[in-house]
UniProtKB/Swiss-Prot annotation:
It comes from the Bacteria. The keyword Protein biosynthesis does not apply. GO terms for cellular component: cytosolic large ribosomal subunit. Belongs to the bacterial ribosomal protein bL17 family. The gene is rplQ. It comes from Streptococcus thermophilus (strain ATCC BAA-250 / LMG 18311). One of its GO terms (biological process) is translation. Part of the 50S ribosomal subunit. Contacts protein L32. One of its GO terms (molecular function) is structural constituent of ribosome. This is Large ribosomal subunit protein bL17.
Length: 128
């Protein structure tokens, strides 16, 4: 399997990919370097495919990769309680149902201007 090293050790690289994949699930669009965007695309496509399957095993596989971060939080005045949605819940309840008729190609990479400090090629990766 071919992949990009991204100038990091394997554990650091996996952590970066997990973080960026979780951020993309939560925000649905992020700005990063082109190389990272192309690597994130692979992991996000796999997570959405797991979300489309929707069974317990798929949910556990996705939970092993996606970070346990809060995607949204709301306050109910009647019960005086906060309710929150995690990135995994958002993946399975909001994002995956959008793509039931689509076979792959869930993300779009748009190239933008180079980063100011080091002229690294930047890109916006977003869910279609």
């Amino acid at each position: 399997m071919a992949y990009r090293k991204l100038g990091r050790t394997s554990s650091q690289r996996k952590a970066v990919l997990r973080d960026l994949t979780t951020d993309l699930i939560i925000n649905e669009a992020i700005v990063t370097t082109e190389a990272r965007a192309k690597e994130i695309r692979k992991t996000v496509e796999k997570m959405i495919t797991l979300g489309k399957r929707g069974d317990l095993h798929a949910r556990r596989q996705a939970a092993a990769f996606v970070r346990n971060e809060i995607a949204s939080e709301s306050y109910d005045e009647a019960t005086d309680k906060y309710t929150s949605t995690t990135a995994l819940q958002k993946l399975f309840s909001e994002i995956a149902p959008r793509y039931t008729e689509r076979n792959g190609g869930y993300t779009r990479i748009l190239k933008t201007e180079p980063r100011r400090g080091d002229a690294a090629p930047m890109a916006i990766i977003e869910l279609v």
